[in-house]
């Protein structure tokens, strides 16, 4: 039916799931039905579509401190939602957990959580991924000895102008700002290279306000959200930080998305 939509669900195969699940949502009733499963990929914990919705890209969240993970490319059958694997490329670091496709459909930018690094992979005309054109290693730590003993790049977001990439590093309590060089597949430190979060907050995810003038950073360890002004040159100025838990909360908690 014309009102039917497809949803793609990434999973951890090490926890018993089998890969990337395609669900069909009935546009009239909202009911979900599993229609296919793409196997042969390990821990596709995060997935993203290209601007045309013709290809899907997934992280392969594998690799210990000495190994490296990968990103995988799939083509999408527009009629059935089936995923056909195209190829995989290494991200150069362990534990890739997040990725984004840029607005020109030319680059995938991925973050390696365990490795504390950022990788850029070019997208070829057929949707396949090329070898890395950029690898940036973050160096640093913060005050939580269990979770912030080193850099942990947790997510990447790209602004509407397709010129800046923002990387939340949970381990360093920083949001890094990069200018995107689309022609060469590079990331260059922006005019404001980074912004510091309050020590121990652990920035995890990042989202833009529809106005394009504000952004919000979700802090996993502090269970807070920090609001920033977004300037025309891509810089960030803090406004306020608010909690996500009741004032009298005394238990352990972390925020996710």
Tell me the role of every PLM-derived stretch.
Residues 162-223:
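Loop-centered beta-sheet repeat module
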Residues 13-16, 61-66, 114-117, 172-174, ...:
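Short glycine/acidic-enriched loop and turn motifs that connect beta-strands
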Residues 34-105:
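Blade-loop segments of beta-propeller domains
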Residues 32-39, 83-90, 130-140, 187-195, ...:
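Beta-propeller fold detector
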Residues 23-30, 74-82, 120-130, 178-187, ...:
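Short loop/turn segments immediately following beta-strands, especially the blade-tip
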Residues 41-52, 92-105, 139-162, 197-214, ...:
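Beta-rich, blade/repeat-based domains predominating
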Residues 81-155:
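Asp-box/WD-like beta-propeller blade repeats and closely related beta-sheet repeat scaffolds
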């Amino acid at each position: 039916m014309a009102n039917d939509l497809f949803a793609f669900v990434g999973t951890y195969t090490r926890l018993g799931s089998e890969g990337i699940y395609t669900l069909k949502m009935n546009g009239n009733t909202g009911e979900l039905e599993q229609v296919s499963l793409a196997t042969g990929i390990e821990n596709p914990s995060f997935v993203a579509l290209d601007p045309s919705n013709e290809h899907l890209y997934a992280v392969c969240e594998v690799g210990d401190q000495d190994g490296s993970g990968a990103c995988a490319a799939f083509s999408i059958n527009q009629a059935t939602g089936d995923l056909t694997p195209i190829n995989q490329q290494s991200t150069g670091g362990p534990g890739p957990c997040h990725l984004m496709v840029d607005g020109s459909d030319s680059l995938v930018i991925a973050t390696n959580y365990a490795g504390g690094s950022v990788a850029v992979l070019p997208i070829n005309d057929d949707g396949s991924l090329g070898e890395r054109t950029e690898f940036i290693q973050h160096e640093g730590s913060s005050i939580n000895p269990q979770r912030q003993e080193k850099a942990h790049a947790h997510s990447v977001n790209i602004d509407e102008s397709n010129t800046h990439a923002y990387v939340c590093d949970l381990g360093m309590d920083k949001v890094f700002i990069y200018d995107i060089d689309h022609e060469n597949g590079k990331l260059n430190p922006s005019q404001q290279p980074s912004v510091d979060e309050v020590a121990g907050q652990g920035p995890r995810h990042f989202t833009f306000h529809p106005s394009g003038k504000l952004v919000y950073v979700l802090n996993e360890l502090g269970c807070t959200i920090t609001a920033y002004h977004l300037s025309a040159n891509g810089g960030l100025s803090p406004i306020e930080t608010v909690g996500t838990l009741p004032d009298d909360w005394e238990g352990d908690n972390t925020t996710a998305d």
